Amino acid sequence: MADMDLLFSFERLKEILDLRGYDKGYEDVAVNRAGLTLLIQQYVARFPLDEDWYRAVNPDVDDAIRSGAIASATEHFVSQGYLEGRAYCPADFDETAYLELNPDLRAAREDGMIPDLRVHFVRSGHAEGRRYK
């Protein structure tokens, strides 16, 4: 796959993605699987991952990093983990901000129903699209 550290011309990017239908003005266009995967990975790479947390909940990744098979938790998450559906926890998760941005959680937190806001975010908040900062 192409080196994505460069900003390609749109013509070159269309070739890399095997983008079909765009130039004809179609509403529905097609890209090859590798091209779509590349776009997804570039998107995912923009978000900081809590590497310690990711390694703790994915012992296979931790083992692979320790053996040198994978360089980092972020590399794994971007290249495979996200596409496999592995859980995401941001490196910059802020419990105070999470509670302020999601006031509906306050009562459940005070009642002890949500003892750990980070766990709540990972298990349901992320899928619900809740903001954390």
What are these regions (language model features)?
Residues 2-133:
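Charge-rich, low-complexity intrinsically disordered regions
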